[in-house]
Amino acid sequence: NIHGDQVRLVNYRNFTYRSASDFDERYEEREIDVSRMASMDLIISYWKIGPVAHTFVSFNFDDGSPPVCISIEVRPEIGESFDPLSSMFKQFELIYIVGDERDLIGVRTDHRNEDVFLYRINASPEAVRELFRIYLDRINRLADRPEWYHLLTDNCTINVIRYARKVGGPHRRFDVNHLLNGFIDSYLYYRGMLDTQFPFAELRQRSHINEAAQAAAAEAAENFSERIRMNLPGIDQKVAR
């Protein structure tokens, strides 16, 4: 439900995990004020060493509210597992998961043993808010008219790039990094979309958040989102959220 800057998010995912396959499902409602949205982060998660990863985003607020995390994924049917080739033949429905970072990031760092990196995107608050509204519109349209995930034309990274173009992001229509998305951080770095105070290799090393996420989860820290951003490049540590 959207009323100006006031948005009610339904089916906001906030699972509690004991393992990757053993968890308590919890869907919540959350009220947010889009006018307090101030920045956004790109999260890249690698399930194995290589050029392919999963990318998703978090939208941050300047009033201390927890970030809103959005992940574009496939919705496999019971008994199905993701297959890249099959995804090009209308096999998997596209789904947008909106939820808590302790769920969407924590399950990857703590239970799936994925390597996760978090980068602050160089974007104005106005662009961030506009991008969030594009996501909302897309989510609402999918509820009425489902679409199919497609490895080459409708995947997690291509959609992020497509939406970013609408608010002034890089306009190159196609780049191999859109598919080999494990390199998307390098692609954005050399286009000025990430913090450039460090050489890229050092930025990447500093942006690895597994250790911080695992420590915060082990302590059941309420400030999980703040903890994983501590000392990350490009993020004001007075408001590390």
Specify the residue positions occupied by each region the protein language model found:
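Generic secondary-structure boundary/loop-capping signal
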Residues: 24, 29, 34, 104, ...
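Juxtamembrane extramembrane loops of integral membrane proteins
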Residues: 5-6, 10-12
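Alpha-helical transmembrane signal-anchor/signal-peptide segments
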Residues: 1-3
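Soluble catalytic domains of enzymes that build or remodel membrane lipids, polysaccharides, and related
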Residues: 83, 91-166, 170-173
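Activation targets extended, charge/polar-rich intrinsically disordered C-terminal tails
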Residues: 136-241
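Intrinsically disordered, low-complexity regions
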Residues: 12, 20, 185-188
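Glycine-rich catalytic cores of cysteine/serine-nucleophile enzymes that process amide/ester linkages
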Residues: 7, 18-116
